[in-house]
C-alpha cells in the first residue's frame, strides 16, 4: 500500500517535531513522576490523582502516535519562489471594496491557523490564490458574499 503523503512547510514540520519532542519529554518525566507520586498515596481504585495522571498519559500517548504518524508521511515543500503563489508563500492582498490590506500564508490543512493568518490551500481563499501572480485580481466567494482582492506581493 502506498503511503499517503502529508505536505508541510518547513516551519510546519519543525513545529510538529518540536511538539513531539516536548510531549515525549513530558510523558517520560513529568507524567511518570506524577503516577509514581500518586501510587505512593495508597489505594489506586479511589485515587483521583492516579486516575487523572493515567488519563493524561493516555491522551499524550495518543497525540505522540498521531504526530509520529504525520511526520512519517511528511513531505516538506521546498523550492518556493515569488513568481507564483504556492503552498508556503506569504501573500499580501488588498480588498478592493474596503482598501484593507492583509498578509496571509498559504499552508497545508494541518498547519492552518486563521488567528495567525495561515490559510489552507484547500480553503476558498487558498484555492483561488494558488497559481496566481502579483497584480492579478481574484474573486473569493465567502459566506458573507463575493469579495475582490488584488495580489500586491508574494514572499517566501
From Swiss-Prot:
Keyword DNA-binding: yes
Keywords from the UniProt entry: Coiled coil, DNA-binding, Transcription, Transcription regulation
Gene3D superfamilies: Transcription elongation factor, GreA/GreB, C-terminal domain, Transcription elongation factor, GreA/GreB, N-terminal domain
Molecular function (Gene Ontology), one example: RNA polymerase binding
Coiled-coil intervals: 6-75
Transmembrane segments: none
Record's keyword annotation contains DNA-binding: yes
Annotated Pfam families: GreA_GreB, GreA_GreB_N
GO BP field: DNA-templated transcription elongation; regulation of DNA-templated transcription elongation
Family: Belongs to the GreA/GreB family.
The protein's role, per its UniProt record: Necessary for efficient RNA polymerase transcription elongation past template-encoded arresting sites. The arresting sites in DNA have the property of trapping a certain fraction of elongating RNA polymerases that pass through, resulting in locked ternary complexes. Cleavage of the nascent transcript by cleavage factors such as GreA or GreB allows the resumption of elongation from the new 3'terminus. GreA releases sequences of 2 to 3 nucleotides.
Protein name: Transcription elongation factor GreA
Organism whose genome encodes this protein: Thermosipho africanus (strain TCF52B)
Lineage per the UniProt record: Bacteria, Thermotogati, Thermotogota, Thermotogae, Thermotogales
Amino acid at each position: 500500500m502506498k503511503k499517503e503523503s502529508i505536505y508541510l512547510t518547513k516551519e510546519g514540520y519543525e513545529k510538529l517535531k518540536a511538539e513531539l519532542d516536548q510531549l515525549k519529554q513530558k510523558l517520560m518525566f513529568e507524567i511518570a513522576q506524577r503516577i509514581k507520586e500518586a501510587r505512593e498515596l495508597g489505594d489506586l481504585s479511589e485515587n483521583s490523582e492516579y486516575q487523572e495522571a493515567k488519563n493524561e498519559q493516555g491522551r499524550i500517548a495518543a497525540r505522540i502516535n498521531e504526530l509520529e504518524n504525520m511526520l512519517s508521511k511528511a513531505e516538506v515543500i521546498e523550492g518556493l519562489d515569488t513568481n507564483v503563489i504556492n503552498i508556503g508563500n506569504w501573500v499580501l492582498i488588498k480588498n478592493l471594496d474596503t482598501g484593507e490590506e492583509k498578509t496571509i500564508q498559504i499552508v497545508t490543512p494541518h498547519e492552518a491557523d486563521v488567528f495567525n493568518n495561515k490559510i489552507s490551500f484547500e480553503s476558498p481563499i487558498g484555492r483561488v490564490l494558488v497559481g496566481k501572480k502579483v497584480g492579478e485580481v481574484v474573486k473569493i466567494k465567502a459566506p458573507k458574499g463575493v469579495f475582490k482582492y488584488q495580489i500586491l506581493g508574494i514572499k517566501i
